[in-house]
């Protein structure tokens, strides 16, 4: 049953995963959602988050959408994914006014829900690693969001086998 559900979620999203160039050809996209990921104690980015931001900024600079929505965990004073994300984007040429921050994107579900219900996004491009994109796109479809994804797999990541296993279970 788990494998059947996993296959269904992957099949539902595979045709919506695009290259940066394909994403730039979409019309009327409200924003590019960059999903949060771990930041270290001093606020430095994990490799996965840095790659998500690099890809998100590339999609933005290609003209795919007018705004970036950084969605991540800022549930504690001493932990701020979205602050680190915005800082990285603005230090790399994205105007501050083009970066929105969702401080309550504690999960993929919450990030997509809040993009629609709080930020009123109807058509989005989601940027995260490919293993994660399938579920993000599936959730967006369930909320009625017209969503496309761009994979941020710029590197090989330590612990990916465990993340892949966890993701299969998360899709159920």
Which residues fall in each region the model found?
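A structural signal for short, hydrophobic/glycine-enriched beta-strand patches
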Residues: 6-165
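Hydrophobic membrane-insertion alpha-helices, especially the h-region
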Residues: 1-4
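Carbohydrate-recognition loop of C-type lectin domains
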Residues: 172
């Amino acid at each position: 049953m788990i494998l059947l559900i996993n296959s269904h979620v992957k099949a539902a999203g595979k045709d919506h995963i695009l290259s940066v160039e394909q994403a730039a050809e979409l019309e009327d996209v409200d924003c590019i959602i960059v999903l949060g990921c771990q930041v270290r104690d001093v606020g430095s980015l994990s490799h996965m988050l840095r790659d998500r931001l690099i890809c998100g900024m590339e999609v933005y600079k290609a003209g795919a959408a007018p705004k970036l929505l950084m969605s991540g965990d800022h549930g504690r004073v001493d932990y701020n994914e979205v602050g680190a994300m915005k800082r990285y984007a603005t230090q790399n040429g994205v105007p501050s006014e083009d970066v929105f921050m969702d401080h309550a994107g504690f999960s993929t579900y919450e990030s997509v829900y809040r993009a629609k219900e709080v930020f009123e996004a109807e058509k989005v491009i989601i940027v995260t690693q490919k293993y994660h994109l399938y579920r993000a796109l599936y959730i967006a479809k369930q909320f009625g969001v017209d969503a496309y994804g761009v994979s941020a797999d710029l590197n090989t990541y330590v612990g990916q086998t465990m993340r892949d296993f966890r993701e299969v279970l998360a899709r159920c």
